[in-house]
Amino acid sequence: KDEECPVIVERELLTFDVSEFPRSHYESREAFLSYSGNVSAEYTFYNPEDYTVTATLLFPFGKAPDYGFQYDTVTMEECFGADTEKYGVTVNGEEIEKTLRHTYAADDFELERDLAKLHDGYADDPFYDPDMPVTRYTYTAGGIDPELDAASAGFRLSGGGGKTKVYMEDSSGYNRLGKELEISAWVNNGVQVDVYMIGEQPEELPDWYICEDGSMEERTEGEMTLTDVEEMTFREFTMMSYDTDSHISETDWYNAVIYEMNLYEKSFGFIESFFDKLDVSDTLMRWYEYEITIGPGGRITNEVTAPVYPEIHGESNPTYDYTYLLSPAQTWKEFHDLEVVIRTPYIMRESSLEGFEETEDGYTLAADSLPPGE
């Protein structure tokens, strides 16, 4: 971490235990946590130097599955991350401490980009800061013809967005109109719309108008009345959906929200809203973070075990696609032998790696270097 690590990976034994497939839906926490699919990576590390090396390692193992059971609506108990508690990290057979980390992961994994998302604290951002002021303006719709079932409220932004960002819950669309950006939301009488102004507050508040439908072409009667104003810090704003009882650290959550907001920022500082109250819990890559120490000329065996979930395709005759991220191992100074063992009673239809041989209890593959890809 922060400098080149001299440690060599002499061998990795990668074992997939796929004795059962997950269900497409779970009715209870207990049923979900009883799923046994896991992946184990056993490394033999060698330190060729004449000094002791202490290294912080990061092991990504994917997002929580959308068919998982993360929140019990009956007991109101948070389950997010509970599936990692039965697995651990060992060095020479002794369990060591690990920390569960999270990064924003709406896209496919890219090594350099996704490693850069991990921070020891709040991420430094050219615009956002935890103490930055945020004001929420709540507007209530009224005076709209009740016969209009697709009425929309809109206002326009101008300027470069360098001093102020605008986030609106439930925005239904936006449209570039010359040097302005039109933002709209579906409304009917009594509907409330929250607009968040982040950073420097504008001299003038939004000048709303009502249109007959989402095309925003024909204006009609109606108004948006300012009914509430609330001030907060940007950190408080990012934490609107954060659960303090979750396995996610506050800073990892904050950094994920920032990444999302930068990703979905449009013209004039407008941030498109895809997630209710900035809830990023379904888009987080999970990592184990832990520390190892190897003496001069020393070797250790380090084993990491984590749950593994496939993507499920089809219903009547489903296929199950498993992905393991090999690319992070490219960061080692040297990587020698890799052995992959898949313990399963099922048939493997295809693999991105060539050379698997069938065995009595599954499949195996041996390589004298790290294969490209995942």
Residue ranges and their predicted role:
Residues 1-374:
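Lumenal/extracellular ectodomains and adaptor appendage modules
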